[in-house]
Amino acid sequence: MKSRNREMFKVGPIGSKQYYDKSWEEKGRNMISSIYVAFNKDSIKCIQFSYFHNGVHVVSEKHGSSKGQSYEIVRLNDDEYVTGLSGIFWERKVTSLTFHTNQGKHGPFCNGTGYSSSYMADYKKEIDVKIRDRREFGGFFGSFDDEFDGLTSIGIYVYPTYDNKPTLNQAWDPLYAFAHNQIPTIADGIPVMHIRYKPKLKDRIFSKLDFKRAMLCLIKVFLD
């Protein structure tokens, strides 16, 4: 677990933390089962999560004010996981929030500015880092003003994973295999992949021709 936390990095947040806001962390909590959202007509007031940790179902602390007038529960399917967020930050408050998953979107919750969507377009922010594996989502973080505004920021942790399985065409290219399987360098706590070999157009054409010839030979051997 220690190495996992060391390699995670923050993306976002939507919103902004002031010096008097309280920070909250749900780092490493990627097995989210439910998200509880409390809000009123103006802003998101409180957020809370339930998740599985070491085989046990755990409910997090409440992050924000308990003054919400409306409540929604986002229940994720067993094979559903968070991939991103979108929302609006207006007058020091998160006034709209949508959770993105591999199966769609949940929200928006609140939409409380009173202005048209076209007017608020410049204030909308989306966090989308193309997460396509549950392991890449590393939990949430954010801040809140408990006395007045509720939730003032929210972002996600991302945990890079590396898939070392090349495609069938790539498996025939030794230069690709060499570059693809290099161990990433850690720079300022963020894994940085080495520049991968990119063959010239003529080399790619000849490589594909060689691949086709090899496949034809295999088919011929099989038929014989």
Curated annotation (Swiss-Prot):
Name recorded for this polypeptide: Jacalin-related lectin 24
Entry's family note: Belongs to the jacalin lectin family.
Xref: InterPro entries: Jacalin-like_lectin_dom, Jacalin-like_lectin_dom_plant, Jacalin-like_lectin_dom_sf
PROSITE patterns assigned: JACALIN_LECTIN
Database matches in Pfam families: Jacalin
Residue ranges annotated for the Jacalin-type lectin domain, each copy included: 8-160
GO molecular function: carbohydrate binding
Keywords attached to this entry: Lectin
Annotated source species: Arabidopsis thaliana (Mouse-ear cress)
Taxonomic classification: Eukaryota, Viridiplantae, Streptophyta, Embryophyta, Tracheophyta
